[in-house]
């Protein structure tokens, strides 16, 4: 598959050929379910001309049916472009196909999608990760040059790691969220999934920057990174020892091999611990579900999307939501409503916000001593479908990614090794706020070390 770096240099006629070849390949691999069009046996959405970029189904593309993979949004057609889509089009890139995801980005496997699950290209019996599982699977399988996803608690990084791709979550506020179907507004961030660090930097440069339409968008000057990538920078890297030691043996062994390579390459390695990740889990699921219960209250059958047959307004609300939302979305909305309710707000929500401030401070203290933090992406390689059927077990699969969202920091996942079954193991690199260049340089250097370049 051609790289994004090379694709943007193609002539118009070559881009047309590339798009046709991709369409044919997508049709031939329908069983993967990376695109909604594969799951619904329909033609790929491709009416915009340019270098094709796969788009997660919660990012608005004008005149496309954008549903966040939920039954409740069936029939909705986006009346406008998300800011990131406008930036793609301006740069000569174009949205190409709607990638599958967990319903409203709530999940880690794509199994909660209304359309059906996506298979992991490395092993069809295993999950691709989530919620951006379709984007990661499409890139991994060569069905996309690159893709956009969204990351609320690891939803770009975890599927990228499970499928063997590079997944980059920028600093919160660096990329506009205007036009992103909101799950948790203080945590959500759009970012790229690609096959290389260089392509991730290129796509990030295109979509980043201030947007007056997004009140949380930073107005700091956005400096390009891809033209400054430096794999030879010597950095101080803090290895989060208790997180590495807490991962599976395969992940642990692979990451310590990576640490040895980084030492040999001249990087300064220090070892640090973070507080027990159970605090991250508790704070994240209180804050995220509280914000989700507010964000998803707009889906009531009145303004847009699916409306259930009913005899009264109250019945319409309850039936529309009961029939339109999946089990996991209902679970999180109920939890969010509970923690915001009178009598529990102080006990849960306020405490969670205090815990979030503590978690952010912990990350900042380590990053005052180091340029980069290194830790696992997930406790293990991609697991089999149905293996984590208990919701709590599934939530714990995100223990190494959610703290980054709570702290609002940039982070990237880089494939470093395959296990004996051919499943990918990735390292997660985290940098200080607004220091995307540090993160991308570290990732670029690690990628070259791993490949032996």
UniProtKB/Swiss-Prot annotation:
Active site: 56 (charge relay system), 131 (charge relay system), 155 (acyl-ester intermediate)
Name of the protein in its database record: Glutamyl-tRNA(Gln) amidotransferase subunit A
Subunit structure: Heterotrimer of A, B and C subunits.
UniProt keyword annotations, A-Z: ATP-binding, Ligase, Nucleotide-binding, Protein biosynthesis
Class of this enzyme: ligase
Family of this protein: Belongs to the amidase family. GatA subfamily.
Molecular function in Gene Ontology: ATP binding; glutaminyl-tRNA synthase (glutamine-hydrolyzing) activity
Segments passing through the bilayer: none
Tagged with keyword Nucleotide-binding: yes
Keyword Nucleotide-binding appears in the UniProt entry: yes
NCBIfam families: gatA
GO biological process, one term: translation
Function: Allows the formation of correctly charged Gln-tRNA(Gln) through the transamidation of misacylated Glu-tRNA(Gln) in organisms which lack glutaminyl-tRNA synthetase. The reaction takes place in the presence of glutamine and ATP through an activated gamma-phospho-Glu-tRNA(Gln).
Catalytic activity: L-glutamyl-tRNA(Gln) + L-glutamine + ATP + H2O = L-glutaminyl-tRNA(Gln) + L-glutamate + ADP + phosphate + H(+)
Pfam annotation, one family: Amidase
Enzyme Commission number, as recorded: 6.3.5.7
GO cellular component: glutamyl-tRNA(Gln) amidotransferase complex
PROSITE patterns (UniProt xref): AMIDASES
């Amino acid at each position: 598959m051609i790289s994004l770096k090379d694709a943007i240099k193609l002539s118009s006629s070559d881009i047309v050929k590339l798009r046709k070849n991709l369409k044919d390949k997508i049709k031939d691999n329908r069983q993967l379910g990376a695109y909604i069009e594969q799951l619904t046996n329909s033609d790929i959405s491709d009416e915009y001309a340019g270098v094709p970029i796969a788009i997660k189904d919660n990012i608005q593309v004008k005149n496309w049916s954008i549903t966040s993979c939920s039954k409740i949004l069936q029939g909705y057609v986006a009346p406008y472009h998300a800011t990131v889509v406008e930036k793609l089009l301006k740069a000569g890139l174009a949205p190409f196909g709607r990638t599958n995801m967990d319903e409203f980005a709530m999940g880690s496997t794509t199994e909660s999608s209304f359309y059906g699950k996506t298979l992991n290209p490395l092993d069809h019996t295993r999950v691709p990760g989530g919620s951006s599982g379709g984007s990661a699977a499409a890139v991994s399988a060569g069905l996309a040059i690159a893709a956009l996803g969204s990351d609320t608690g690891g939803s770009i990084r975890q599927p990228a790691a499970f499928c063997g791709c590079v997944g980059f979550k920028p600093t919160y506020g660096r990329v506009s969220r205007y036009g992103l179907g909101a799950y948790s507004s203080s945590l959500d961030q759009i970012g790229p999934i690609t096959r290389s660090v260089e392509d991730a930097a290129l796509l990030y440069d295109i979509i980043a920057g201030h947007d007056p339409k997004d009140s949380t968008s930073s107005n700091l000057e956005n400096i390009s990174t891809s033209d400054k990538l430096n794999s030879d920078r010597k950095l101080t890297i803090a290895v989060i020892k208790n997180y590495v030691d807490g991962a599976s043996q395969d992940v642990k062994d692979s990451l310590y091999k990576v640490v040895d390579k980084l030492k040999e390459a001249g990087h300064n390695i220090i070892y640090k611990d973070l507080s027990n990740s159970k605090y991250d889990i508790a704070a994240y699921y209180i804050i995220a579900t509280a914000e989700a219960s507010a964000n998803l209250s707009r889906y009531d059958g009145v303004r847009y999307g699916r409306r259930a047959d009913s005899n009264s307004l109250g019945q319409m609300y309850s039936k529309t939501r009961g029939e339109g939302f999946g089990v996991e979305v209902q679970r999180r909305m109920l939890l969010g409503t509970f923690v915001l309710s009178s009598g529990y707000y102080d006990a849960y929500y306020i405490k969670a916000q205090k815990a979030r401030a503590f978690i952010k401070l912990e990350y900042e203290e380590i990053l005052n001593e180091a340029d980069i933090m290194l830790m696992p992406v997930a406790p293990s390689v991609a697991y089999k479908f149905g293996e984590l059927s208990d919701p709590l077990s599934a939530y714990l699969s995100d223990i190494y990614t959610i703290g980054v969202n709570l702290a609002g920091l940039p982070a990237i996942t880089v494939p470093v090794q395959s296990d004996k079954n051919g499943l990918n193991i990735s390292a997660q690199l985290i940098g200080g706020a607004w220091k995307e260049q540090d993160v991308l340089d570290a990732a670029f250097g690690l990628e070259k070390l791993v490949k032996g370049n």
